């Protein structure tokens, strides 16, 4: 759940000129989805980085801190520093009837040292306590990819991704041509294991 400014700076550092307005994030997609489906003024419990909190406020959602504040929705986004108590509050809120939204289902994310748990692992913690799945805004769901094509005015995009189960599947779900790169969680050996 990095801010678009961080991603744009990263792309620019790699030699790809980019402005924050060129970046569409799953954090933007999930807060937009909640605002569209539930409306402004919706109380949301956020289990994600402060960037998601900021985006929620920009969309006139009202972040709350605990299930006892009766949130109407829970928004989960990746947070490498998530506290266990935050996941517990998310579980309590969903158990009490709050709608559950997530930015992406990535079980892992690559680092220089190897794979680490991703948002999908954090979702599994809450999921172990409830009887439903979250509504997904990011890949492989369509909202993020459609928002990207709309914002950039793409007519025949090629989606580049390093995860077969989210990036490439998401492109396929949206009818977008994809290019699989070997820089992330999946490699050549996974092509025969994951059927898309």
PLM feature segments, named:
Residues 1-66:
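Active-site phosphate-binding/coordination module
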Residues 56, 61, 160-192:
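Acidic, Mg2+-coordinating phosphoryl-transfer loop and its flanking beta/alpha structural elements
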Residues 68-81:
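Short, well-ordered secondary-structure micro-motifs within conserved domains or adaptor modules
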Residues 83-105, 178:
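A short, gly/pro- and small-residue-rich
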Residues 99-123:
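Histidine/lysine/aspartate-rich catalytic loop segments that bind and position anionic ligands
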Residues 134-169:
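Conserved Lys-Pro-Asp/Glu-containing loop-to-beta segment of HAD-superfamily phosphomonoesterases
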Residues 194-196:
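Conserved small/polar residues in nucleotide/adenosyl-binding loops
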């Amino acid at each position: 759940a990095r801010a678009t400014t961080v991603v744009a700076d990263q792309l620019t550092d790699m030699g790809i000129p980019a402005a924050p307005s060129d970046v569409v994030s799953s954090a933007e997609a999930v807060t937009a989805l909640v605002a569209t489906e539930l409306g402004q003024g919706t109380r949301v419990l956020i289990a994600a980085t402060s960037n998601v909190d900021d985006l929620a406020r920009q969309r006139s959602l009202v972040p709350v801190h605990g299930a006892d504040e009766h949130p109407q929705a829970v928004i989960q986004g990746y947070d490498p520093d998530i506290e266990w108590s935050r996941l517990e509050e998310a579980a309590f809120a969903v158990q009490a009837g709050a709608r559950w939204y997530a930015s992406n289902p990535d079980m892992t994310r690559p680092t220089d040292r190897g794979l680490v748990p991703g948002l999908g692992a954090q979702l599994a913690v809450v999921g172990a306590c409830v009887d439903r799945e979250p509504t997904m805004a990011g890949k492989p769901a369509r909202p993020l990819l459609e928002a990207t094509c709309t914002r950039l005015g793409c007519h025949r995009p090629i989606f580049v991704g390093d995860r077969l189960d989210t990036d490439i599947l998401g492109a396929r779900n949206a009818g977008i041509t994809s290019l699989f790169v070997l820089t992330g969680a999946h490699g050549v050996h996974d092509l025969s294991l994951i059927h898309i």
